[in-house]
């Protein structure tokens, strides 16, 4: 633990007033606070132990252990562990702070990739914890200094409202429209059985063995027409379609349900509660940081509202090249219209937020095309916190739409906090395998759902694992993973009376309202466009991805948080990866994709400069930046060219992914795909997949409308199966 404390205190050290000049009390307090003074190392250790499930986690353990010895410190730190005084070579924690800073900075660009991984991982988690941890009042000592207000009073808990107006409001008005459709398996067994039976589900409780439960001897058996594993944009839509068609549907969700009244909108808590692995997910080489939802509503609960229809050139490609007739059909176009209408998708906004104003102005100055982004939220929804859940319920994710249809039909229920362990199927010799249901775990207890059809919609990162552990052998399961890799650049706009308005903050306003789709001509590719948009970055994620060159520089960068605009370039990647297990995501950026991302980064830097940023930079570990106002046009051009030409595969920059797809792709032959054009698996009848994993290739834009449209069509296919097979 000494080594971890020393590393955290090096990343975030105490800096006295003399080192920062004249500042007000809140800024002075922020600079003087170290990681250990705020309890950061203990929380970092807990996160690493409980949330970080990475195949190379051993590097952290080994590195921290080595640093606890003088010889290990010599191995990892080299001559910098030499002090010139007996005992000459010292453990990392006994070295002067300045020397420790030099060591960490050396790791960030080390020839050895394991040292770069060690630096990147501990830096990201330390920063994330320091800037997201809160006291009993829900505040963080750094927030005022960096200009972050946290959740506004409008987003506060409903305790007062519940106490004063509980007689005036119905429970679903306070807790959300899924209030009556959630089954809490922590409730008494009799209450669970009563709720299931009340919705028409046959329940049997014939457990024989008192020592534990198993698939052959479960705690409970539940019978239904269809069981859906996953409640996101795929599973939620499929479940809603089936329930409205009159079939009994049970939804199994590994994440928990957070009603509107339970949403804190605190970044750290929301990530821990509603993101896969608490937001601590990355490819096997840690080169790509991955964000994915894990809660009722899935990614639609925490995404950024963009609701873009499948591009015409992608539909044409999937229909002609992949020979999937669905994407050239009227049915698919109707499906897109249906899901957009159900989500209330519209393109307008009453007021545009800081980041999007910057993107729009920069594009207009450069003559680049820029347009409004369709969103599943009303035009007056000026909220930058929807990545942490929508407290007002205005963002129309599946928990506000398709899952509501499920609940209101009286044909469906949702079981949150349940981990599907196996898809069950009949396996009679000489006959085709037929799905018969799903086994799932709630804590240590095993339950079984017996169904006529089974739909797996765990998302592109989890569906392959469930299918593989259920015995499916198709070689395409877990392959062809696309990530829509993203690279970002930043621009600092001081608080001045001139544009952009002084009152606006980087974390406020609609997360996505403007976008630019630009063909990267330099790649000579007809594959698609580079999409340029803005992200949602609250202090934790912001601090996790910005460069670190010293503790003082890092804290100074964070002072600019509220007026630093970020813009990213999203790539429709040609290269693909594989998923071998829950934790092993192998993805190597290919050369062509890397060049496209570099070109995208160049364009983003130019947009920020054109928009009027005083300072611009990227997330490269060197931490270079340029004062645009004092630089000549030649200096700006040279800086943009140099920063955008740096390699992206060596862990020196930062690549992110919020969209994962293609890992069980749809096709017309089992040799090249995992599921049929109907969504049914090649190996098991009545087993369907309905999430982004069925995408034939990368999409190139935000995938919510596309996956919902595909799930809608697959849902109709399942209805046909249920009609035929009574």
Swiss-Prot record:
Q: Where is the active site?
A: 659 (proton acceptor)
Q: Name one Pfam family in it.
A: GMC_oxred_C
Q: Which GO terms describe its cellular component?
A: membrane
Binding of FAD occurs at 224-239
Membrane topology label: Single-pass membrane protein
User: Under which main EC class is this enzyme filed?
Assistant: oxidoreductase
Catalytic activity annotated for this protein? a long-chain primary fatty alcohol + O2 = a long-chain fatty aldehyde + H2O2
Q: Name one GO molecular function term.
A: flavin adenine dinucleotide binding
What keywords tag this UniProt record?
FAD, Flavoprotein, Membrane, Oxidoreductase, Transmembrane, Transmembrane helix
User: What residue ranges are annotated as transmembrane?
Assistant: 103-119
The Enzyme Commission number assigned here is 1.1.3.20
Where does it live in the cell? Membrane
Q: Which InterPro entries match?
A: FAD/NAD-bd_sf, GMC_OxRdtase_N, GMC_OxRtase_C, Long_Oxdase
The UniProt entry's sequence similarity note says:
Belongs to the GMC oxidoreductase family.
Question: What is the purpose of this protein?
Answer: Long-chain fatty alcohol oxidase involved in the omega-oxidation pathway of lipid degradation.
Its recorded name reads Long-chain-alcohol oxidase FAO4A
Organism name: Arabidopsis thaliana (Mouse-ear cress)
């Amino acid at each position: 633990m000494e080594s971890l404390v020393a590393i955290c205190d090096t990343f975030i050290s105490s800096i006295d007033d003399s080192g920062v000049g004249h500042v007000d009390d809140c800024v002075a307090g922020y600079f003087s606070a170290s990681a250990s003074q705020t309890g950061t190392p203990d929380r970092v250790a807990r996160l690493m132990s409980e949330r970080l499930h990475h195949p190379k986690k051993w590097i952290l353990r080994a590195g921290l252990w080595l640093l606890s010895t003088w010889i290990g410190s010599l191995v990892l730190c080299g001559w910098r562990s030499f002090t010139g005084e007996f005992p000459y070579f010292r453990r990392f924690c006994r070295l002067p702070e300045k020397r420790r800073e030099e060591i960490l900075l050396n790791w960030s660009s080390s020839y050895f990739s394991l040292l770069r991984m060690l630096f990147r991982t501990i830096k990201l988690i330390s920063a994330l914890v320091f800037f997201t941890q809160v006291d009993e009042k829900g505040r963080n000592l750094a927030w005022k200094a960096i200009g972050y207000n946290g959740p506004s009073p409008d987003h506060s808990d409903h305790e007062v409202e519940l106490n004063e107006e509980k007689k005036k409001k119905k429970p679903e008005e306070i807790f959300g429209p899924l209030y009556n459709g959630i089954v809490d398996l922590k409730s008494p067994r009799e209450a669970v059985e009563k709720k299931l039976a009340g919705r028409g589900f046959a329940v049997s409780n014939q457990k024989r063995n008192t020592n534990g439960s198993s698939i052959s001897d479960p705690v409970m058996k539940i019978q239904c027409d269809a069981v859906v594993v996953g409640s996101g944009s795929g599973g939620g839509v499929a479940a809603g379609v089936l329930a409205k068609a009159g079939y009994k549907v049970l939804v199994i969700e590994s994440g928990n349900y957070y009603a509107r009244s339970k949403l804190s909108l605190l970044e750290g808590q929301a990530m821990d509660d509603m993101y896969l692995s608490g937001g601590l997910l990355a490819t096997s080489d840690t080169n790509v940081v991955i964000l994915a939802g894990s809660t009722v509503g899935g990614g639609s609960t925490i995404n950024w509202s963009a609701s873009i229809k499948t591009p015409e050139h992608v539909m044409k490609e999937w229909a002609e090249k992949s020979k999937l007739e669905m994407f050239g059909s009227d049915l698919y176009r109707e499906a897109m219209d249906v899901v957009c209408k159900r989500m209330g998708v519209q393109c307008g906004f009453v007021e545009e937020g800081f980041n999007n104003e910057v993107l729009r102005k920069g594009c207009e100055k450069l003559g680049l095309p820029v347009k409004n982004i369709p969103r599943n939220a009303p035009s007056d929804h000026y909220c930058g916190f929807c990545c942490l859940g929508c407290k007002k319920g205005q963002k129309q994710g599946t928990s506000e739409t398709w899952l509501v249809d499920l609940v209101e039909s009286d044909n469906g229920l949702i079981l949150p906090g349940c981990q599907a362990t196996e898809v069950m199927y009949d396996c009679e010799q000489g006959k085709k395998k037929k799905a018969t249901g799903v086994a799932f775990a709630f804590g240590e207890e095993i339950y079984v759902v017996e169904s006529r059809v089974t739909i797996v919609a765990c998302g592109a990162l989890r569906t392959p694992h469930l299918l593989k552990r259920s015995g499916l052998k198709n070689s395409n399961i877990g392959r062809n993973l696309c990530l829509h890799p993203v690279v970002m650049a930043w621009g600092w706009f001081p608080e001045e009376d001139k544009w952009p308005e002084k009152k606006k903050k980087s974390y406020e306003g609609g997360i996505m309202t403007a976008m630019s789709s630009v063909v990267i001509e330099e790649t000579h590719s007809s594959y698609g466009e580079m999409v340029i948009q803005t992200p949602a970055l609250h202090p934790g994620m912001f601090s996790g991805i910005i460069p670190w060159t010293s503790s003082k520089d890092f804290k100074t960068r964070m002072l600019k948080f509220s007026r630093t605009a970020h813009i990213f370039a999203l790539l429709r990647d040609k290269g693909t990866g594989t998923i071998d297990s829950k934790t092993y995501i192998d993805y190597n950026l290919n050369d062509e994709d890397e060049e496209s991302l570099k070109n995208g980064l160049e364009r983003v830097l130019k947009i920020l400069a054109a928009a009027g940023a005083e300072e611009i930079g990227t997330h490269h570990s060197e931490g270079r930046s340029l004062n645009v106002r004092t630089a000549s046009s030649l200096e700006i051009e040279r800086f943009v060219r140099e920063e955008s030409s740096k390699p992206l595969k060596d862990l020196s920059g930062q690549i992110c992914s919020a969209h994962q797809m293609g890992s069980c792709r749809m096709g017309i032959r089992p040799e090249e795909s995992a599921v049929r054009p109907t969504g049914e698996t090649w190996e098991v009848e009545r087993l369907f997949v309905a999430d982004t994993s069925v995408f034939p290739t990368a999409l190139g834009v935000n995938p919510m409308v596309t996956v919902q449209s595909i799930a809608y069509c697959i849902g109709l296919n399942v209805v046909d199966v249920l009609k035929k097979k009574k």
